[in-house]
UniProtKB/Swiss-Prot annotation:
Residues 153-250 form the HTH araC/xylS-type domain. The modification 4-aspartylphosphate is found at D55. It comes from Staphylococcus aureus (strain MRSA252). The gene is hptR. This is Transcriptional regulatory protein HptR. SUPFAM superfamilies: CheY-like, Homeodomain-like.
């Protein structure tokens, strides 16, 4: 759904952010990387990402110059720096930067920022009447990054790891030392929906990314864990109030 450009002259940092952060959980399905501001500017102009994460001190074109070049674009920016100095703070204030992160990057802190950002992006899409607006309410329960219950968080993690398989509730809770009835009741109390409902909503959410990649619909159904295409189609219509084909037409 959303796109991000990660710009840093240190390969270990940009590739680390690309690989370690669970971008799909925050609805970012396309991640681009650049080693300097020149590469980043080209990617930004070409792909129009919703988020840019950039270092400040880089060769060829630094982060401040990059901010100047993209000031007219509608994208969010997170600044990375090894220096807690006024130069990049001033640049960030001038360009309405979303947040600042000092290296080494605290991944948990970045995920908190992403959680806030995705809520804003989805709300904007809903207000603008864009194609994702109908699914905003359906996917609202999936937006919370962490719950205040250990078992609920474990179940959510298991869903995200195994949704592509023909997984059952028993499979999802087999690694936690509680009964199935307790797990189901606790999950519903904290999340507001059942485990099975969460699983199916998450599968449909992931399917939207594959619809954008021109897979056949029966292939998508299998890739996101539905045993039959008709079950995929049923849940798609249930949550989005339209068929996969109609969604694709509306998204064009």
């Amino acid at each position: 759904m959303f796109k991000v450009v990660i710009c840093d002259d240190e390969r270990i940092i940009r590739e680390g952010l690309k690989q370690i952060i669970p971008w799909g959980d925050y609805h970012f399905n396309t991640i681009y990387t650049a080693k300097d501001g020149v590469e980043a500017l080209s990617l930004i102009q070409q792909h129009q990402p919703e988020l840019v994460i950039t270092d400040i001190r880089m060769p060829r074109k630094n982060g401040v110059d990059l901010l100047n070049d993209i000031a007219h674009l509608d994208c969010n920016v997170i600044i990375l720096s090894s220096y807690d100095d006024f130069e990049y703070m001033k640049a960030g204030i001038q360009h309405h930067v979303l947040d600042y992160l000092l290296k080494p990057v605290d991944h948990a802190q970045l995920e908190v920022i992403l959680g806030r950002l995705v809520r804003t992006l989805l709300e904007q899409q809903s207000q603008n009447g864009r194609s994702l607006a109908p699914c905003h309410d359906a996917f609202q329960p999936l937006l919370k990054v962490e719950y205040d219950d250990y078992y609920v968080n474990q179940i959510v993690d298991q869903i995200k790891q195994s949704y592509q398989t023909k997984v059952t509730v028993s499979d999802l809770i087999q690694h936690i030392d509680v009964s199935e009835s307790y797990a189901m009741r606790t999950f519903k109390d904290h999340v507001g929906i059942t485990i099975v409902d969460y699983l199916n909503r998450y599968r449909i959410l992931q399917s939207l990314q594959l619809l954008d990649r021109h897979y056949k619909h029966y292939e998508i159904a299998d890739k996101v864990g539905f045993s039959e295409y008709k079950m995929f189609s049923y849940h798609f219509k249930k949550y989005l109030q339209m068929s996969p084909s109609d969604y694709c037409k509306q998204a064009k």
